[in-house]
Regions:
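Glycine- and aromatic-enriched mobile tails/lids
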Residues: 1-9, 13-174
Length: 174
């Protein structure tokens, strides 16, 4: 459990020290099983399950009504490919603020186009995947734009140094 009540962390962010079959701690299937079970047990012990707990999160139900399948499937595939190229060209390992800004601008336009497909046509797996690609790409670009340092494979030529003083690290001695 993290310092926030009810929030649990697993995987690399958990820093549990469990190794499993991996050489890196907190990056194994063992952690998935053990930490998930411990988190479940902890949550169940905190309070009984509420029968009035919300089952939806204000996501409007989609009703296809008289909508048709998209007549411009090639546009969906073009947008799909554009996201891949955009992320490779502007948001790959070596980044600049200008390229990140260009990527964010284009992703906003793609988001509007995908929204039109999502609400105007019958949903297909390709539309859902395109919507998810735009969402994940937008999150990656947003996080990259907020980072004002270079760390690991996140190198921004506008911020070539590390800001180690901003990070609390755990050191283990063997």
């Amino acid at each position: 459990q993290t310092s926030l009540d009810g929030l649990y962390a697993a995987g690399e962010t958990g820093c549990t020290g469990l190794h499993g079959a991996n050489r890196l701690a907190s990056n194994s299937l063992l952690e998935c099983v053990v930490v998930a079970k411990r988190a479940l047990d902890s949550m169940l012990s905190l309070q009984p399950l509420r029968k009035d707990a919300p089952t939806s999160y204000d996501i409007p139900a989609w009703h296809h009504g008289d909508t048709a399948l998209p007549d411009e499937l090639s546009v969906i595939y073009h947008n799909w490919d554009e996201i891949r190229r955009l992320m490779w060209d502007y948001v790959s390992i070596v980044r600049t603020n200008k390229r990140l800004d260009r990527a964010a601008t284009r992703l906003r336009m793609l988001h509007r186009e995908v929204k039109d497909f999502y609400w105007g046509y019958r949903i297909t797996p390709d539309i859902l995947e395109l919507r998810n690609l735009v969402a994940v790409a937008s999150l990656i670009v947003d996080c990259a734009m907020r980072r004002n340092e270079s760390r690991g494979l996140h190198f921004n030529t506008d911020y070539p140094g590390k800001l180690d003083h901003r990070f609390v690290t755990q050191l283990h001695r063997w």
